[in-house]
Amino acid sequence: MKKYLILDFGKVLAYHKTGDWFITPLFLELIDMDKLNREDILKAMSNFSDILSRKATTLEEEYSIFYDFYKNTFNILNYSVSEEILENLAIDFTYTDHKYGFYDDIYNELDILKNKYILILLSDNWPCCNPIMDERNLSKYFDKIYISSFYGTKKSNGDFFDILINEYNIKPGEAYFVDDNESLLDIAKEKNLDVRQMDREGVVVSSKHEIIHDLKYFY
């Protein structure tokens, strides 16, 4: 019998408004996209996963991460930006939530599910996730929220799952895990979690895991 429902944040509770997590609405306002190709930007950003993987437990530490992240991204693109723009981009990512949209039915889904499961959030994310969850009145649904930067790890390392599993003493067959990323579900399955792949937008053609389109599946 399932006792726990472990959820990812991105594409399960929330989505990015611009199509990419790090290209925020403010990014599109401040950066001349006629001079930069989006694919080139994303390719440049992919070089700095080490920066994004730094341990951060405060918003100030997160700000430093994203200041360095954007600075290095523009350096590799040979695109000149002012100090003010770098600061504004880092502030925007860390201290605002307008970059995210939340699925319309998420409150009703969680309100029902909290009476059936122990709800846990497991997210590759940064300290900004906590105030965002609070401001959107979502934290109250979760028994605990695990943010990867607090532990200096991420789901792809596997040990992030171990932290949660050990703290709750979760036995095989006791927990569902929902994520939109097939490779992360592979890792979760190795940890004896019963996995489902979320596809709220209906874009996944096939997967080795069972595909769901909302959290009503778990009612």
Feature locations, PLM:
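Glycine-centered loop/turn motif at secondary-structure junctions
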Residues: 31-35, 78, 116-117, 137, ...
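Soluble or luminal CAZymes and related metallo-dependent hydrolases
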Residues: 62-69, 98-105, 156
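A metal-dependent, Asp-based hydrolase signature
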Residues: 50-90
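Substrate-recognition element of Asp-dependent hydrolases with the DxDx(T/V) motif
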Residues: 83-102, 106-134
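Short, surface-exposed acidic
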Residues: 31-47, 75-91, 172
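Active-site neighborhood of HAD-like aspartate-dependent phosphohydrolases
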Residues: 1-47, 190-191
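Asp-based, Mg2+/Mn2+-dependent phosphohydrolase catalytic module
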Residues: 1-7, 126-219
